[in-house]
Design a protein with these regions (language model features):
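Core SAM-dependent methyltransferase catalytic element
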Residues: 406, 410-464
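Short, solvent-exposed loop/turn elements at domain surfaces
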Residues: 78-79, 185-186, 202-206, 438
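The AdoMet/dcAdoMet-binding core of the Class I SAM-like
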Residues: 2-29, 42-47, 51-165, 169-171, ...
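Short beta-strand micro-motifs enriched in acidic
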Residues: 177-186, 418-420
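Short loop/turn segments at secondary-structure transitions that flank enzyme active sites
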Residues: 182, 200-202, 302, 433-436
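Aromatic/acidic cage segments in peptide-binding pockets
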Residues: 193-234, 409, 440-455
């Protein structure tokens, strides 16, 4: 049987090589079939097999692993795109990752159950001949038979219901989805999320969902889970409450560094001003405006993202919250060149990710950490101002974080760090001037309100 040149090339590791193909379903007619009869997210006569080689240098004997795509989630961008596949691969220590699941043409149910996990042992036995054939030749050196483990994907989802797919001119395809989160030992929590196809493993925004008052009154016994199963029309975002995402809580906590200055400003009747570089679904600017009484300017690169924020995440503009479409980094530089006194901010909060999906998830973009851009950000801050950055160091570049810390030390007076604790995010807070008060000072109305949004992250701020 003739083998295509692409498959023939799999005999060796080629950095970043990605290919996918259809293969006769080895589970068909067997009790080990994790996909049932092919309906509602199951696999039919063929399965989709996708192979990705790591962009990182391979060891002398590269290792291969495989993963079964969860039933019903085969069209989820985490499993169906190269960007999602790359994120999964980089979270392991393998040089090649094989994904096997239903073909993308197979339908998915409107509400996808996510809790069930197939028994990997019988499925592994059925897949093993294919997996061995997909190992590089060097893995068979000295007549060895390589081990190809079957990895398991875990997240905290119980249900997933796509609400709307839209495409923006800058970020490309995106999806709004309602999900049920496992909050054991408590009840499941419903949230609305926004994800981009170019970085499917990164949740751009998520907010809690609650039932519309009319729906809750009409069926007081119905649960939020039942509302999700029934119709998203019965649900609405819970706007103005505590922030869901820990890294956003940590970003807000960074304001504690200048709490005395903000307290003094509020007491004098002057609202502190904040520039939010990156709006997403609007959780951060809405919380700062509503919960902390800031005057907020948000800048988002893609107007479609702002439309999604207004229509699906409860973003409401008013005299104290304005959003603009544009390049946030360019706007920072433009403001700095004008040097207008009324354009000074108490805080500049940067929540921007890299636009290069092949770098996996990383933040902020490289343009943001140039010394000239950081100097421009310092210029538009007042004397007691802070620059707060959400940082996700790229997995393949261990020097990124140290380099960012070094350049911030060169431009700003002091630097503080919060480790979000999720293995990905760090929040860096850089001050224009040396701080004269201790972070241990817990007094003041502003800090009381800040704790409602930031949780216990105020206790994790450390100077570096």
């Amino acid at each position: 049987m003739a083998v295509s040149p692409e498959l023939e090339g799999l005999r060796r590791i080629a950095p970043s090589r990605f290919l996918s193909f259809s293969f006769p379903n080895p589970f068909l007619g067997h009790a080990s079939n994790p996909y049932g009869d092919g309906g509602g997210g199951g696999a039919g006569e063929c399965i989709r097999v996708a192979v990705l080689d790591s962009p990182l240098p391979a060891p002398a004997v590269p290792r291969t692993a495989a993963m079964l795509v969860l039933a019903g989630r085969h069209r989820d961008w985490i499993f169906s795109t190269r960007a999602g596949h790359l994120h999964l691969l980089l979270s392991t220590r393998f040089s090649r990752l094989v994904l096997a699941g239903p073909e993308l043409s197979a339908p998915s149910p409107p509400v996808i159950p996510c809790a069930a996990r197939p028994d990997p042992d019988p499925a592994h036995a059925r897949l093993l001949p294919l997996l061995l054939a997909l190992c590089p030749m060097v893995a068979f050196r000295d007549n060895a038979v390589p081990e190809v483990p079957l990895l398991t994907f875990h997240d905290d989802l119980l249900r997933l219901a796509p609400v709307k797919f839209v495409t923006g001119p800058v970020v490309g395809e995106m999806v709004v989805e309602d999900v049920a989160i496992d909050s054991a030992p408590g009840s499941p929590e419903l949230r609305r999320r926004l994800r981009f196809k170019r970085m499917p493993c990164l949740v751009q925004t998520q907010v809690r969902l609650c039932q519309l008052p009319a729906a809750a009154a009409a069926s007081s016994s119905s649960s939020l889970m039942e509302a999700l199963e029934g119709s998203g029309g019965f649900l609405q975002p819970d706007v103005g409450g505590s922030l869901v995402e820990p890294y956003l809580q940590a970003m807000v906590a960074g304001l504690a560094v200048i709490a005395p200055s903000i307290e003094k400003s509020i007491q004098s009747g002057v609202r502190p001003r904040c520039l939010c570089a990156g709006v997403g679904g609007g959780s951060l600017p809405m919380s700062i405006r509503v919960g902390l009484q800031f005057n907020v300017l948000g800048v988002e690169a893609d107007g479609v993202v702002l439309d999604v924020a207004r229509n699906h995440f409860g973003l409401v503009e008013d005299e104290f919250l304005h959003v603009h479409v544009g390049d946030a980094i360019q706007m920072i530089e433009d403001f700095s060149r004008r040097r207008e006194p009324d354009m000074k901010f108490s805080a500049v909060m940067v929540d921007l990710d890299s636009s290069d999906a092949m770098c996996s998830v990383s933040a902020p973009p490289l343009e943001m950490i140039h010394g000239s851009v950081l100097l421009a950000a310092r210029t538009i801050l007042d004397q007691q101002g802070v620059l707060i950055l959400n940082v996700i160091p790229p997995p393949a570049d261990g020097s990124f974080y140290k380099g960012l810390v070094d350049v911030l030390h060169q431009v700003f007076a002091e630097l503080y760090e919060i480790d979000v604790g999720n293995g990905e995010n760090f929040v860096l807070t850089a001050t224009v001037s040396p701080m004269e008060t201790s972070l241990a000072d817990n007094s003041g109305h502003f800090l009381t309100e800040l704790r409602k949004l930031a949780g216990n992250f105020l206790e994790h701020i450390r100077r570096i």
